[in-house]
Swiss-Prot record:
PANTHER family: 50S RIBOSOMAL PROTEIN L3 (PTHR11229), LARGE RIBOSOMAL SUBUNIT PROTEIN UL3C (PTHR11229:SF16). Part of the 50S ribosomal subunit. Forms a cluster with proteins L14 and L19. GO terms for biological process: translation. One of its GO terms (molecular function) is structural constituent of ribosome. GO terms for cellular component: cytosolic large ribosomal subunit. SUPFAM superfamilies: Translation proteins. It comes from the Bacteria. This is Large ribosomal subunit protein uL3. The lineage of its organism: Bacteria, Pseudomonadati, Chlamydiota, Chlamydiia, Chlamydiales.
């Protein structure tokens, strides 16, 4: 049932590799340290079946850890072995998958060895407050002399009837920092010694950001 698990990794950047045909392929590098099962949820006790994974263990004295985390989290960590984690992620799985794992079990990048495609979820790069031309690709207004709305959105409504702007129109707003999932990325290589995997193409987030990797359920059409 390892195929249903999602692992927490870190985006290390991008690089180029040559495939077997000699083509240059742009790849994203994801490092995946061993993930620990921090909690098991069942339909009888929680209403659904899920596995909570913990990653990026905190290496600090016990007194320092007690100051950084609440008592509720410290008690939660003790149930899975006492190690405190910076990142906790939960994945919904089947009842058989919950029964096949135990608290404290470790899973690493080896579960993706032999997998052809994966889905990667992360937080996209923040771009700040942006206008409609950058965020939505609007054409903008005339660029000639005398024009007063070069980068404006244009008309956003009527006059006295209805006397308001309809909600849902595209306006200047904050861009980025969204939860994004890129599906069906090809796995180029899994390096068990370095605990990294290479996937073809780009993944969301900046260098060093946390991503969640899982096996693809199917090909996106």
């Amino acid at each position: 049932m390892r195929s249903q698990l999602s692992l927490i990794g870190k985006k290390e950047g991008m690089m180029h590799v040559f495939d077997k045909n000699g083509n240059l392929v742009a790849c994203s590098v994801i490092s995946i340290e061993p993930n620990v099962v921090a909690q098991l949820k069942t339909a009888s006790s929680d209403g659904y079946n899920a596995v909570q994974m913990g990653a990026d263990a905190v290496k600090a004295p016990e007194k320092t850890i007690e100051k950084r985390f609440s008592k509720a989290l410290l008690g939660h960590f003790k149930k899975s072995g006492g190690c405190a984690f910076r990142v906790l992620k939960e994945v919904v799985v089947s009842e058989e998958a919950v029964q096949s794992v135990s608290l404290g079990d470790e899973f690493g990048v080896e579960i993706f060895d032999g997998v052809s495609n994966v889905d990667v979820c992360g937080i996209s790069k923040g771009k700040g407050f942006q206008g409609v031309m950058k965020k939505f690709g609007f054409r903008g207004g005339p660029k000639s002399h005398g024009s007063g709305f070069h980068r404006h959105a244009g008309s956003i409504g009527m006059r006295s009837t209805p006397g308001r702007c309809f909600p849902g129109s595209k306006r200047p707003s904050h861009m980025g920092c969204d939860r994004v999932t890129v599906k069906n990325l090809e796995v180029v290589k899994v390096d068990l010694d370095r605990k990294v995997m290479l996937v073809k193409g780009a993944i969301p987030g900046f260098k060093g950001s946390v991503v969640v990797v899982k096996r693809s359920c199917g090909v996106e059409g």
